[in-house]
């Protein structure tokens, strides 16, 4: 999926440059998956929260050359490795009742639009696909620190978004587990 989007970006860049207009200059950043993570939380019995993490399998952030503001973000999560540090609950969350990781081992986010909301803040709108269902979602995003690490540059993106699990077919235990799931995303991108 990421390869198709990257090819699409390259094709669009080539076509744009072929018109005699200035060519687009993009910088492609890739997530350092060992330093990137998605945390999730949902209310439980109306008085507590269940928290967990879903590993980022890969993520790509595309910016204009020399800029850090994203204009394209793609993220693939490994739902089969979701963890809440409770083996029984993790097995339940990976089951057909919730994420159905056996049939849908990945969760995909593809951005559609990025709107600047401040000097280092953005709203990233896109499509979240899980359990075979694609729905719109938006993330409040901010750019963290930029640092140089040898010959590589690293930038930190932090984002928060919410979705209703029932919209993805996760209706089990609705009176016990809340419907609104909060995702807190940290991507350390490298170029």
Enumerate the language-model features and the residues they cover.
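Bacterial N-terminal signal peptides that target proteins for export
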Residues: 1-10
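Low-complexity, acidic/polar, glycine-enriched regions of mature
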Residues: 21-191
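Cleavable N-terminal signal peptides
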Residues: 9-15, 23
